[in-house]
Amino acid sequence: MTKRQPLYKSLYVQVLVAITIGILLGHYYPETGVALKPLGDGFVKLIKMVIAPIIFCTVVSGIAGMQSMKSVGKTGGYALLYFEIVSTIALIIGLVVVNVVQPGAGMHVDVSTLNASSVAAYAAAGAQQTTVGFLLNVIPNTVVGAFANGDILQVLMFSVLFGFALHRLGSYGKPVLDLIDRFAHVMFNIINMIMKLAPIGAFGAMAFTIGQYGVGSLVQLGYLMACFYITCILFVLVVLGGICRAHGFSVIKLIRYIREELLIVLGTSSSESALPRMLAKMERLGAKKSVVGLVIPTGYSFNLDGTSIYLTMAAVFIAQATDTTMDITHQITLLLVLLVASKGAAGVTGSGFIVLAATLSAVGHLPVAGLALILGIDRFMSEARALTNLIGNAVATVVVAKWVKELDTDQLQAELASGGSPLVDTRPTDDLGVAEGPAR
């Protein structure tokens, strides 16, 4: 029988306490809270520092170790099919809820009185977002550039090609594969060290958020926030919960299993901050490395359920608040634009707002200056977006793995029943005594 870890050593408890202290400090000492922003930024940068090499190692090791290349194409095809269906459902749910509840009705905001300069940078960034540009951006100018910029899709593109090439070499490429596996062990050990700083990062980020924007900004547009949070909760419990039940597992148990990652995301407002740990945890949950390596990184651009809900709700809210007519034709057009635009949102803080700006620019019917209405509360809404995105990608990984018969269901049930013990304590060690990454 394993000795139970003391409560104060649990990362879950440490991050939760840090977030609470950050909220209190930001509220009562806002200037001090704002000054702590570098703590949150520094932690997120440390995580981003190792995301690219971890994705590379995971994807290459998974693909190169597969028996057949057909299974890679099958996994990718099923993943994209799942992403498109579920994210479309999320967009429609957001559209339905905002039309039924109408959180912006009665505000009668005059667009000419809004401070458009406050959102000019977002509008300019959004105007540059095009479908062709997005697709071309997946191809890196140089391999080094992809890793230097930390662009997930560019790194994924190169990693898949590298994995295919290494697989074709057969036994001749095995020394390279072994080297990559050992390099992965080093990267995951770095992640273990960085995660010890998670409470500090969450504390600094939350103190800054409350200190900068204040609790008062939550009250002003609280109706929209409440609608959005409730919609995200219902989406997770009803839609994702239904998908989980149909595939033989519980979404509640899955949420409990990834609770530490969810708290890290809550503190940083970026689902990207939990990506390295999610790669390891989903594999430990019973999904094969090849599936995890493809689904998780791709999902960070193509399966952002929380962002999809936010985009439709925010766009129609702006129309309602500014008394802009949105008939059925306009709303269908909005939905079609978002089906494409939502795929360009990465799992980083602020990306959803940029995609919203791009959508308003593309539709043309909605006032881009209306972004100023939700600029103050967007940072608070980003938590719900990031949490929903993370849960959605966890569900997608298990479901796709089951579809392609690359899921150990016994291991899945055992891990979910255990509640997910700390990742660092469950790693086996190799003959050098070094903690390993997930088994291939």
From Swiss-Prot:
PROSITE patterns, per database record: NA_DICARBOXYL_SYMP_1, NA_DICARBOXYL_SYMP_2
In what way does this protein cross or attach to the membrane? Multi-pass membrane protein
Which InterPro entries does the UniProt record give? C4_dicarb_transport, Na-dicarboxylate_symporter, Na-dicarboxylate_symporter_CS, Na:dicarbo_symporter_sf
Q: Which GO terms describe its molecular function?
A: fumarate transmembrane transporter activity; malate:proton symporter activity; succinate transmembrane transporter activity
| Role, per record | Responsible for the transport of dicarboxylates such as succinate, fumarate, and malate from the periplasm across the membrane.
Q: Where found?
A: Cell inner membrane
GO biological process, any = L-aspartate transmembrane transport
Name the chain's protein. C4-dicarboxylate transport protein
What does the similarity note say? Belongs to the dicarboxylate/amino acid:cation symporter (DAACS) (TC 2.A.23) family.
Location of the region described as Disordered in the Swiss-Prot/TrEMBL record = 419-440
Transmembrane segments annotated in the record for this chain: 15-35, 46-66, 78-98, 146-166, 190-210, 224-244, 291-311, 332-352, 354-374
List the GO terms this entry assigns under cellular component, sorted alphabetically: plasma membrane
Q: Which UniProt keywords apply?
A: Cell inner membrane, Cell membrane, Membrane, Symport, Transmembrane, Transmembrane helix, Transport
**Keyword set includes Repeat:** no
Organism superkingdom: Bacteria
Record bears the keyword DNA repair: no
Q: What is its main location?
A: membrane
